[in-house]
Each structure stands twice: as structure tokens, then as C-alpha cells.
Amino acid sequence: LFNSFLKTDEFIKVFEGTLWAEGPCYIPHKDMLVWSDNPNNRMMKLVDDQVSEFRNPSNFCNGNTIDNEENLISCSHGGRCVYKTDDNINVSVVVDRFEGKKFNSPNDICVKSDDTIWFTDPPYGILSDYEGYKGEQEYEGCYVFRFNPHTQKLDVMTKNLDRPNGIAFSHDEKKLYIADTGENVQCLYVFDVLNDKIINQKLVYDFKPFFSDGFRSDKDGNIWTSAGKAVKCFNPNNELIGQILVPEL
């Protein structure tokens, strides 16, 4: 069954030279792949099989996605905010405060069909100057947020994770997956989505000694996630159905 998803077993190296390759995001109307090279403080792009810089400096952007108008939506460690980049590469701040306090360092992000923006906020970008700017946490904890760009309303979705990291909806948006990459927790969890809330947190997989970082859902509801030496695939029943070993770690 798993092999039926794979059209090829060939790896194609798109680019070599990033310190960390994070947040790959495809922008359909541009036929362009964008990703972050976080410690190098830049973003890269792939167009017509050619790689070049998309933005430098990027203010230490990390996770990326697109909104429903195919604008690029990015988490910025350096800005401690969420950015929107339009077709002309104009960058604007979407949201940068929680109750008047700076975010920690928004890490990963997804956009729902109702235009709401969901993102995780661990402190990795403020722990040192390596992937952001060393700074202090201004609120206690590491939350998962939901921002409505139409009403400008920001809501906390959960406070119950140690270091929330990767985040993605299932294809039907009935489930929300969130990775926790805390010191003693390297797990992927799934929540049921009920209106504007998430409930019924369940464990999908414990990845120790590795962890699940970025992931996305396919149209069949399978979750494809980075996980140490492999890309692992879980079906909608949270069962591991296969993995692809990668040649580089």
C-alpha cells in the first residue's frame, strides 16, 4: 500500500549549501518552491530548476505556507512575528504581539480555508543569536495561536505542549497535527477540530531519540513528516505505514 504512493525511489538533490533547510513551500501560480535557510538568515527559491536567493536577509524566517490567495506566510524568528510576502516581494507584518507582549519566535504555520492563520511559538529563535536574536520571553509558556486576519483576533489554541513545533491540518481540516519537540518530549499529537477550538489530544507517535519537525497532509489524509533519518508516513488512523530513508541527515 505504501509503495503505491511513491512514483519513484530516486532522490533528486535540489540544492546543497544551506545550514538548515526549513519550511519548504510550493507557490502554485508561480510554479516556485521557497524554503528557509534559517541560520544563514536567508530564503531560497527554486524556479525552472534553478536555485537562487529569494530574500536576504530574511530576518531569520523559519516555517512557511501560503494563504488562500497564494501569498507567502512566514514565521520570523528575528522579527518574533508572522510575515506576509506578496507577489512583488513586499513584506508586511501580519501579527507580532500577544496581549501586548512579543511572541517567543514563531516557528511553523498553516492556514485554514476560512483564512485563519495557525502557528506555533517555541523559544528557539531567542535562545541565542544562531537562528534569531537572543532575547527574553515576554509571556510565560509556549503556545499555539490562531489569528483571524479579518477581525484581527488572536486566540490561544493550546498551552499544554512543552515546545510546539510543526503544525498542519488534515486535508479535510477535521484534525490538527502538532509536533512537540521539548527536551523530554519528542512526539507528534493530533487534535480534533471543533469550530474554532481543538479538543481530544491524542498521541500519534513518539519519535525519541529523533523528533517530528515539519510535516504536511496529503489529499488522502496521510501525514508525511521529517523524522531523523527518514520521512515517515502515517495514515488517518495514526498508523505508521512506511518510511523513506534519506541519504543525508
Show where each model-derived region lies:
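Beta-rich, blade/repeat-based domains predominating
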Residues: 16-31, 57-76, 80-81, 99-117, ...
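A short loop-to-beta-strand structural motif that recurs across blades of beta-propeller domains
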Residues: 42-44, 81-83, 143-145, 187-189, ...
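Short loop/turn segments that connect beta-strands within beta-propeller blades
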Residues: 46-50, 86-90, 148-152, 192-196, ...
